[in-house]
Amino acid sequence: MANESLLLTIAVLGGTGKEGKGLAYRWAKAGYRVLIGSRSSEKAVTTASEIMQLLEGSSSVVGTTNLEAAGQADIVVVTVPYSAHRETLESVKDALKGKLLVDTTVPLMPPKVSKVHVPAAGSAAQEAREIVGDDVEVVAAFQNVSHKHLLEEEEVDCDVLVTGTSKTARSEVLKLVEAAGLTGWDAGAIENSIVVEGLTSVLININKQYGSKHAGIKITGASQSS
């Protein structure tokens, strides 16, 4: 993992947000070169500096625009709200050709965020696939992980379900899940992302009903040991 991380650059679009910042921190800590992308390069530079301070300058984290980040990266991760999903992807799609796109977006529709919303494409990930085209492998992951856990050193009590356009692409993202200190599961084709995205609204509802803040999911009855 360490050798591979030194060879790859990850762009986190919308990386100034809580989810993006947390993932960027985890990957930078694991040794990846990380680019923080944002519509505002100034905000991206500030967030990158904050992450570098947390890591005591031991990793490479750089802030720039979404387009610049996408163009320089090997793997591009989208961590924007659903309201900015299409606009963000449209703005960088030419820079994504031949690359791996990881979509963390959940199609939440405020104020009814505890109710599952199904986009016309079936899911946010399938919508992303329609926007970026067949030259881009699209994988959906990290939708159910609370951002709060990502900036903490303690173990994250939530598994990651990974769906995507090919098994090879899903395998690559499972490596990123592991690098972030999480447990990932190959959950199959990208069409299955509709279920994974919907679970986020279910978890939000559970948080409200039971007074919790960071409900997550765990896969039981299966083993990853070889």
Annotated model-derived regions:
Residues 6-9, 98, 157:
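Phosphate-coordination loops involved in phosphoryl transfer and adenosine-cofactor binding
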Residues 63, 137-143, 185-187:
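General beta-strand structural signal in soluble alpha/beta enzymes
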Residues 55-60, 64-100, 104-112:
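Rossmann-like NAD(P)-binding element
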Residues 2-53:
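NAD(P)+-binding Rossmann beta1-loop-alpha1 motif at the extreme N-terminus of oxidoreductases
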Residues 159-226:
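Active-site-lining helix/loop region of Rossmann-like oxidoreductase modules
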Residues 105-152:
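Rossmann-fold NAD(P)-binding glycine/threonine-rich loop
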Residues 81-84, 144-145, 166-167:
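Short beta->alpha connector loops
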